[in-house]
Design a protein with these regions (language model features):
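An amphipathic, aromatic/His-enriched active-site/gating alpha helix that lines ligand/cofactor pockets
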Residues: 56-83
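Short S/T/G/P-rich N-terminal loop/turn motif that feeds into the first structured element of a domain
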Residues: 1-33, 40, 50, 82-90
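Short, flexible active-site loop motifs that bind/organize anionic cofactors or intermediates
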Residues: 11, 53, 67
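A short linear hydrophobic-aromatic micro-motif
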Residues: 37-43, 76
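Amphipathic, hydrophobic secondary-structure cores in small proteins
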Residues: 41-55, 61-63
Length: 90
């Protein structure tokens, strides 16, 4: 299944409490359950004002549908074309 990186612009998101992150994750998981097994949240990276999420999904429309249901932005959705790591240099 295609992999996507979603950029979510969320001012001061890096300052949220553990409780707030828990509530946001629960809302996201509920939206995932409503959509079905064709979308999977792998993990997210939180910075000061953005969250970068990595998902598996059939297409961008499914990612946007999830964002709408969860009430969270999806400012940029980028399909992953290739992954590289230090072993790529070998």
């Amino acid at each position: 299944m295609p992999k996507f990186v979603i950029e979510r612009e969320m001012p001061n998101v890096g300052n949220l409490s553990d409780r707030e992150f828990c509530a946001a994750a629960q809302k996201s998981i509920q939206a995932l359950r409503e959509i079905g097994p064709q979308i999977q949240w792998l993990h997210s990276y939180v910075t000061g004002n953005k969250i970068y999420c990595v998902y598996l999904a059939p297409d961008e429309a499914t990612i946007q549908n999830h964002a709408n249901k969860a009430g969270i932005p999806a400012n940029r959705i980028s399909a992953v074309r290739r992954m590289i790591d230090p072993t790529t240099a070998e």
